[in-house]
Amino acid sequence: MTFARPDPLSALGTPSGTPSWISSARAETLEDATFFSGAALSHLHLVLACEEAPHALLRDRLALRAAEACVAFSGRPERAAELRDAIHLLRPGDLPGPAGETCLEWRRAAERPLSVKALARALPGIEPGQIASWRDAGRGPPVTRAARVLEAVLSDAPRAQAPALVLADAALAQALGWPHLVPLLAAGVA
């Protein structure tokens, strides 16, 4: 006997799925892309404002997708299922490997409220002072702020693609007033 898996987001009633004019349209100009991106962020903001939504589950799932994208950037073959298994099957004292470490960075970054301390915990190879400096590099509207943080990190540490994307997502979340990092940018860059 098989059971249908419950879909907690569809049970909420508000808000419904992404409007078709956002998800089916193709941006032909920079203005279109800007508009559709803003509309998608606005819709996500409504989901994150809904108290009944499983925020931690959403962030964890997006963190897995972001880790998968970052692992692919580095040329590694691991995909979401292997990353998930690598993390969940770790025994005390085991090392997760490079791909597993990337996955852990994203999960740690998304699970705690935004702060330099939480980001330093998620990115153990980066000093808290450096995180604060990069975070402060972003000024302006939310997407511009995220882009400036990404640019600042990659100009100082060109091989730190995953940490750069984590910090850019943190800047975006902070600018939008979200209490937690929501992994969005890495999957979009892939």
What is the meaning of each model-derived region?
Residues M1-A190:
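FIC/Doc superfamily catalytic core
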